[in-house]
């Protein structure tokens, strides 16, 4: 803040998924001094800029399985893609979450992510999640909020033509990236060997849609 206020015309670029934690450590907010840009995994439209229709179609299965992180494009071997995603989950995503406010129940957060992964596109009951995990509903809400802030998952509120009922409807949760979702449940099997192909497509289409908001 001091740099921006004292040096005319200067621009400072900061990156990182843990930027949300800075808001609790800064003495003063940067209201009016910042512009936030969210960078999602690559969109299908971006791939189409350097791949023809045939190439893009042939790559669809890989996108459904491994997602769209840019770094994955350099790996030709599927095992390398899997190892890359495992590294992101273990050393990056979970690390960010656990460091935040000193959370120690890593197994509960991972189990919560697995439950969400198996219920992609379905209405999710917080009470049911709490019961299955053996924790309170408030803790589930807190964990979901953190997972949203580090861009692992996002919610789609329930819909009803009756606005009063809409408020009480359960949310649906989706992953920002299919690869992370599959990494959480440790399933990178090919499409013909899976029973969750519909969920993969729904999550992929939903994540593509949010990239254009």
Walk through the language-model features, giving the residues of each.
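Conserved AAA+/SF3 P-loop NTPase catalytic/coupling segment centered on the Walker-B
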Residues: 1
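Sensor-1/coupling segment of RecA-like P-loop NTPase cores
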Residues: 4-26, 147
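Acidic-histidine catalytic/liganding microenvironments
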Residues: 7, 38, 212
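A structure-centric signal for secondary-structure junctions around beta-strands
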Residues: 9, 33, 57-60, 150, ...
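Hydrophobic/aromatic beta-strand patches that form the interior of the parallel beta-sheet core
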Residues: 13, 35-37, 174
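Conserved beta-strand termini and adjacent loop/short-helix elements that scaffold enzyme active sites
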Residues: 15, 39, 156-158
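Interdomain motor-coupling "hinge/lid" segment immediately C-terminal to the ATP-binding subdomain
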Residues: 17-19, 23-125
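Accessory nucleic acid-recognition modules appended to NTPase machines
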Residues: 78-213
């Amino acid at each position: 803040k001091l740099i921006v206020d004292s040096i005319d015309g200067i621009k400072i670029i900061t990156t990182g998924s843990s930027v949300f934690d800075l808001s609790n450590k800064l003495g003063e907010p940067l209201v009016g001094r910042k512009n936030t840009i969210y960078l999602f995994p690559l969109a299908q439209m971006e791939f189409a800029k350097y791949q023809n229709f045939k190439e893009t179609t042939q790559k669809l299965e890989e996108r459904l399985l491994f997602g769209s992180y840019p770094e994955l494009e350099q790996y030709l071997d599927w095992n390398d893609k899997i190892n890359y995603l495992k590294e992101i989950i273990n050393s990056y995503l979970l690390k960010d979450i656990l460091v935040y406010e000193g959370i120690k129940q890593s197994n509960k957060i991972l189990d919560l992510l697995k439950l969400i992964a198996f219920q992609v596109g379905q209405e999710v009951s917080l009470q049911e999640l709490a019961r299955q995990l053996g924790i309170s509903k408030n803790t589930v809400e807190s964990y979901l909020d953190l997972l949203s802030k580090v861009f692992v998952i996002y919610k789609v509120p329930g819909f009803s033509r009756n606005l009063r009922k809409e408020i009480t409807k359960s949310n649906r949760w989706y992953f920002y990236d299919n690869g992370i979702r599959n990494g959480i449940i440790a399933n990178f099997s090919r499409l013909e060997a899976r029973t969750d192909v519909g969920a993969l497509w729904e999550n992929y289409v939903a994540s593509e849609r949010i990239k254009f908001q």
